[in-house]
């Protein structure tokens, strides 16, 4: 999974976030497929990022805050004069699903997605539901450069009828470790003891042999995994967005 996908896996397990998502208003207006428009309040949690989410399910539509997530591409939408020779940008012409979120501050957030990947735009200016010209800054801080260039390449690919390139969505290198931590968190949230977690994650034979070792290596490993999982669930996932 990508870093954003791992961030979502931890955030969506946060009980406060789940309550906020459940309490948030539902979509109130829809357009014809493949474009859907929402107008709703944000779902947040006490230790979390400003985030809009359809639900807290694994495959939910999720909008991350541009203030936190480096993968969101900010663009300016401008009306095209009738005499313009510029090819207009039209959501309904793209070879992907498009969801537009209308935020309370009048901001427009666009999520472009195919079966595997997503691209999020933070749009200011003209109404993105009409044919427009999109502009963005050409110079970015060094820490944003790689992410912005990837997002631009994704946007260009969609604009010429291609899919979102898989090579622009690298997997998180810490995936195996995060998977271990996530499974430990799930077990802990379900009420499992540390020994039960160890048996599920490492195997009963190893646990029977090493659980009472005075050096506590196995116990410490489980304790660290649970602690790390809860930290990621309660706000630490933000590090995966930057």
Where are these regions (language model features)?
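Accessory, usually C-terminal, subdomains that scaffold auxiliary metal cofactors
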Residues: 174, 178, 202-242
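Intrinsic-disorder-associated interaction segments
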Residues: 10, 141-148, 215, 222
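DNA-contacting interfaces and partner/effector-binding or oligomerization modules
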Residues: 1-133
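Amphipathic alpha-helical interface segments used for dimerization/assembly
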Residues: 11, 21, 185-188, 201, ...
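Mixed-charge (acidic/basic) macromolecular-recognition segments
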Residues: 134-208
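Surface-exposed polar/charged interaction patches
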Residues: 27, 158-161, 232
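Short, charged/polar micro-motifs that form catalytic or ligand-binding hotspots
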Residues: 3-11, 167-174, 183-187, 212-219
């Amino acid at each position: 999974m990508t870093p954003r996908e791992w961030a979502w896996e931890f955030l969506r397990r946060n009980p406060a976030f789940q309550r906020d998502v459940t309490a948030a208003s539902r979509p109130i207006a829809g357009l014809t497929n493949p474009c859907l428009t929402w107008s709703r309040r944000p779902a947040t949690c006490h230790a979390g990022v400003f985030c809009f989410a359809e639900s807290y399910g694994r495959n939910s539509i999720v909008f991350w805050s541009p203030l936190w997530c480096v993968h969101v591409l900010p663009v300016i939408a401008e009306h095209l004069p009738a005499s313009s020779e510029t090819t207009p940008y039209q959501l309904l012409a793209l070879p992907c699903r498009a969801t537009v979120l209308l935020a309370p501050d009048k901001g427009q957030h666009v999520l472009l997605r195919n079966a595997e990947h997503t691209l999020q735009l933070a749009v200011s200016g003209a109404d993105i539901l009409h044919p427009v010209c999109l502009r963005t800054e050409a110079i970015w801080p060094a820490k944003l450069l790689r992410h912005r260039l990837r997002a631009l390449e994704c946007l260009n690919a969609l604009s010429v009828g291609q899919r979102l390139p898989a090579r622009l969505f690298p997997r998180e290198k810490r995936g195996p470790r995060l998977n271990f931590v996530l499974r430990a968190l799930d077990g802990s949230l379900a009420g499992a003891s540390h020994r039960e977690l160890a048996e599920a994650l490492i195997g009963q034979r190893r646990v029977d042999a090493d659980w009472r070792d005075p050096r506590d290596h196995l116990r410490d490993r489980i304790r660290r995994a649970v602690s790390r999982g809860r930290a990621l669930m309660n706000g630490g996932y933000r590090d995966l967005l930057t």
